[in-house]
Structures are given as C-alpha cells and as structure tokens.
Amino acid sequence: MVSFSKNKVLSAAVFASVLLLDNNNSEFNNNLFSKNAKGLNSNKRLLHESQAHAGDAHHAHHVADAHHAHHVADAHHAHHAANAHHAANAHHAANAHHAANAHHAANAHHAANAHHAANAHHAANAHHAANAHHAANAHHAANAHHAANAHHAANAHHAADANHGFHFNLHDNNSHTLHHAKANACFDDSHHDDAHHDGAHHDDAHHDGAHHDDAHHDGAHHDGAHHDGAHHNATTHHLHH
C-alpha cells in the first residue's frame, strides 16, 4: 500500500494552484491584449473615416474655419459653413472665407460677402457678388460689379441682362469704357462664355488660368457679360453702339 506524507500532498496542491493561477493570468492577459488590439483597430478605423470625411467634406455640417477645403465640389452638407475656402454649392454659407466672403463660390445660396460668387441667390453685402465682381446670375445682388443676369441688382457695374435697374459707372479707357457690346464684339483676342476673366476656360465661377464656364473675364472662352478683349455672344456691355 502506497502512503503519502502530508508534505507531499501539500506540495502537490500548491503546485496545482500555481498552474491554475498561471493559466487564469494567461487567459486574462490574452483577453486584455485582444481588447486593446480591437480598440486600436477601432481608433484607426475612426481616424480613417474622419480623414475621409475631412477630404470629401460632404458631411461637414457647420464646419468652422474650413480654410483648406479648396474647391470642394458638391459640398451639399456644408450648411452654414463658416470661413469655408472655395466651398462650391454652399447653401446659406454665412461669413465663410471665399464662400461667404467666398472666392469663386459656385451656386452659393444666400452667400454673404461672396467674391466672384456665381449664381448667388439673395447674396447680401457680398464682395464682388453683392458688391460682386463678375457674379453670374446673382439674384437680388446689391452693388454687383459686372454681374451677369442679376435679378434686382442695385448699382451693378456692367451687369448683363440685369432686372430692375443698374448704375453703370464706366471708368478708364479700356474695356470698361465700352458699353453694350453685341455678338462677336472683340477686344484683346479672346471670346467668352459667361462673365469671366483672366485668360482661362472656366466651368463655374473661377478665374486666373483655369478652365471655367461661368462668371470670369480677361482672355477666356466666354458666352455673355464679359470684358477685356473677347468675342461676346449675349448681351455684353463693354462696347458702345
């Protein structure tokens, strides 16, 4: 008959407890590592999603100081974006830099202080939109400079097809002194599509060396309401009959 001493039995019990504790610790550590890894992956995923939305700016709702959202196309949800730079199609953008105060903001609805805003609806106190320079199709633009097809534009300079009164303040002896041009009225070897400038094809409310279709001038293919040496097709205002 085999006999065991109390010491041997006790030692075996302690050893078994140590093994059990070690296994439990290993399982706990493995679970903790797994959770940390999942958390890290989740953070990476959120970071990538954030970066994707920042680049696309599609859901940038009420984005403040979006200065580097440069030429963002279809920023449909940049609603009331503050200080958005080159936000396109911004709806009710207030005080946005180059959107409301927007430079080349296209189709800005109620854009305030927009520079070169094309198709701006009810732009108030806009710089070069209401006080807008070459704003195309601005609705209710006040004091628009070279606004094309502006509805109710007050004190518009060289506004084409503007409804409800314009005060033309022609100056210098360049294209600004040429009033009411007809089709194919040429100056400075270029023709224009619609209110543009600075030597470029333009698609929508832009200027200075780019392809643009709307609201620009100076050496580009344009259709209506332009100046500085171009073929003009519709109701241009730079040549006296």
UniProtKB/Swiss-Prot annotation:
Protein name, as recorded: Histidine-rich protein PFHRP-III
Alphabetical keyword list: Malaria, Repeat, Signal
Signal peptide: 1-21
Keyword Repeat among UniProt keywords: yes
Annotated spans, Disordered: 52-145, 195-241
Regions of compositional bias (Low complexity) in chain numbering: 84-145
Basic and acidic residues composition bias: residue spans: 52-76, 195-231
Lineage of source species: Eukaryota, Sar, Alveolata, Apicomplexa, Aconoidasida
Disulfide cysteine pairs (residue numbers): none
